[in-house]
Design a protein with these regions (language model features):
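Juxtamembrane regions of bacterial inner-membrane/periplasmic proteins
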Residues: 1-230
């Protein structure tokens, strides 16, 4: 008799987790992203909440969001190439997941005893930006995988890349390629050089710590330029 409450509890927890994960198979909707632009993302809202709870908000300073939506054709081919080469070189070939990269990340996480390395594709990063926070957990990764799968079913690769390049974080309050190009180089994303594009691309893994003029960005962008197609 004593085991029944434990079994009931386990059943309840399992059912709750299954429902919590399962709802992502149908909600939130994805199809509207084919023709409409998201006004904000869960990640942007997360950053704003961080700001509101931080020291600068206490000084009465509001977080300024810099973002200007542009179609993919108005983003320099060099930046598109740089981001794909740096972040997800199999982007045009996979269906949302790079299983070899995921295995390597899983192995590194296992060796470190914590969830550190990501191994995420551009599609996975877009799903995370749109609907989730940076929380690192197995449960969130499963939800992210479901939303990535749905993105790949609903949208073509060009649209996925366009969305990603318009919502990716490129600094404190700087989102999207157009805002990043204007903020750091004083020009439109359409007019970026190969060198400028490479510097922006290697900022993406750590946009709050890296700037185009930092030593690590110069070093990494130099390596990236050698890998980028001409």
């Amino acid at each position: 008799w004593r085991k029944r409450p434990v079994r009931s509890l386990l059943f309840g927890v399992t059912l709750f987790l299954m429902l919590d994960i399962g709802r992502y198979l149908v909600w939130p909707p994805v199809g509207w992203l084919e023709t409409e632009q998201p006004r904000t993302t869960s990640f942007m809202e997360y950053r704003q909440e961080q700001w509101q709870n931080g020291p600068r908000a206490k000084d009465g300073k509001a977080m300024r969001i810099r973002q200007q939506w542009v179609p993919l054709k108005r983003i320099a081919p060099a930046l598109r190439q740089a981001v794909v080469t740096s972040e997800d070189d199999l982007f045009w070939k996979h269906d949302g997941f790079n299983f070899s990269q995921m295995y390597d990340a899983l192995k590194r996480n296992w060796d470190k005893g914590r969830m550190a390395a990501g191994g995420s594709t551009i599609s996975q990063q877009l799903a995370k930006n749109l609907w989730f926070t940076p929380e690192r957990s197995i449960l969130r990764k499963i939800k992210e995988a479901i939303m990535t799968w749905r993105l790949e079913l609903a949208l073509d690769k060009e649209r996925i890349l366009e969305l990603y390049l318009n919502v990716a974080e490129w600094g404190n309050g700087v989102y999207g390629a157009e805002a990043a190009a204007r903020h750091y180089f004083g020009k439109s994303a359409a007019n970026l050089s190969r060198g400028e594009a490479a510097r922006l691309a290697v900022m993406l893994p750590s946009p709050l710590r890296r700037t185009p003029s930092s030593a690590i960005v110069k070093r990494l962008s130099s390596r990236l330029l050698k890998r980028m197609p001409r």
